[in-house]
Design a protein with these regions (language model features):
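Membrane-proximal interfacial segments on either side of biological membranes
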Residues: 1-193
């Protein structure tokens, strides 16, 4: 059996080594070398920010390989002072030769007014938000993410989920921002009633 645990702290973390499918870590995952019940490996990294992205701070990246399963449960980050994100029930696996990350995200809203300002949401639709829970699936090779099963303040809304299920984020950051803002505002309007 192989047991190891690595902990580290840095000012900035470069996530391209973890999420770019051509980098060494994703390539190792594709070999399925970690699908071994004798490997028990934990990697925990804390960072003040993400390289080339000043919006996200206080990153805690926790990864674990145990019993041939790979997850990033309890990984966290903050979007400025607006919201905190926490990942749970995650699993990284290979499907048809592609690396997939499935999981759940809990978003704790710190300042909903700042989020509404960022989204340019009309004032008459701005309701106070506390938490958002949702499922997600990220394909490392296609650089795409889909969202599902959204609950706002522990309430499931069919209309919001129909809108959120339309969200598929691709690699183009500018297009994603505009597309995401428009769809999120559509969901907020539905939530506001």
């Amino acid at each position: 059996p192989f047991y190891s645990s690595l902990n580290g702290k840095t000012q900035k973390i470069d996530l391209t080594y973890l999420i770019n499918s051509n980098e060494i870590i994703p390539q190792l995952l594709k070999t399925e070398i970690f699908n071994n019940k004798n490997i028990d490996f934990k990697l925990n990294i804390k960072a003040d920010s993400i390289r080339n992205n000043f919006n996200f701070v206080n990153i805690v990246f926790n990864s674990k390989i145990q019993e041939a399963l790979i997850d990033i449960d309890n990984s966290k980050l903050e979007w400025k002072n607006f919201a905190r994100f926490n990942i749970s029930d995650s699993l990284i696996y290979i499907n048809d030769g592609q690396i997939i990350l499935d999981g759940k995200i809990k978003i704790e809203i710190i300042d909903s007014n700042e989020i509404y300002k960022y989204l340019l949401t009309p004032k008459n639709y701005r309701k106070n938000l506390n938490t958002i829970d949702m499922g997600f699936s990220y394909n490392f090779d296609e650089k795409s993410m889909s969202l599902k099963d959204i609950n706002i303040d522990k309430i499931y809304n069919e209309n919001i989920n129909k809108i959120i299920n339309k969200i598929i984020l691709k690699d183009n950051n500018l297009q994603n921002r505009i597309y995401l803002k428009n769809l999120l505002n559509e969901a907020i309007k539905s939530y506001a009633g």
